[in-house]
């Protein structure tokens, strides 16, 4: 099922029995986030929340409800992308990557259905007034204080838009980028844009600054859930996130022209903030911010965005999220990326069977990888290859295990790893780029990494002892116990 709007997504969550409507007055300053944090820590991620009576900083009631933890469970994450299991999209990517031009006219004709599917992905421009421009604030009408922008943690530098889709365009090639960068509210019409140096939006800004030209920026808040997710996906700079969202939705994203700048926006967005960055202006202080590491990221200097227009639907929902000590909603977004992009990782490192980034590792700190080991030193080959893969280059600890290990179960992965390693023999250290949020690295964005080879050791690797087999019950006994289990009076596992 493809969902075209955020409201449709919320209705689908409600129909699935996973939405709690909070009708009691709750402050956008801290209270809303404390409630959300407690819910996100519940087993399975807790329900989605729709706060219908949000109190703004001036004590008045917001006209707009706030949705939070909308993506915060495995079932809701799958629902948002229109699949039963997140691996389903990975399977679709595998089939596309396996496209080989067959011999003969009939063979070529057999490819048409898959090629036609690809042709449906690019976004389409919508004619007429789009839903996202049913209400328009321009110039002096712009007042960000009227939006339920949340303050998450006590030491945060201010209120933050935490689920934005930041739209920019490459000034050289005209390629659009949609990124998810936190945005701090500084005033009624001013924001601070936190895009880290390695992000595509930051590269666009640097290019515009070198030219001395104002940079148009659009911030969409709320859209179809596939587009919202795609803004967080680690796509190459040349891939339009709206094309990827079209692939996930199985139909194109509808776009519309912004009113005050030369950019396109999701036609079905709930809110759109249009504006610009002036390269002649000094950078502004952004932060601190309670981040997904569970620690505050410190204040730093970033560009200011001047908002020239705010447009919205007539009855919009303001989506938000919070990050902090794991597990949080962002774990489920990251898990979707893990499942969807596995085929692309296998394309360049074919011996990989699976990989997993557990919640405690907050994505970049810990990665488990299972491989089909065929020759000595292969685990280290895989480590080096993964450290050369885009954002995987930021991984601090890589643990490589054999193909039979379920890396999606961290308890099993650690059990195998801690039994299989000789620390001196099986660990390797190297230096490389680190996440900008890593406060432990010896230098900003640069530090050490550790690789752990927890695979079964081969004689060629200098292991001369017998390697013990894993304990397993025989299949006949398991079948016999399965048959008698209902009569034993023991609760089902």
Regions inferred by a protein language model and the residue ranges of each:
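Extended, highly charged
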Residues: 1-288, 292-304, 308-493
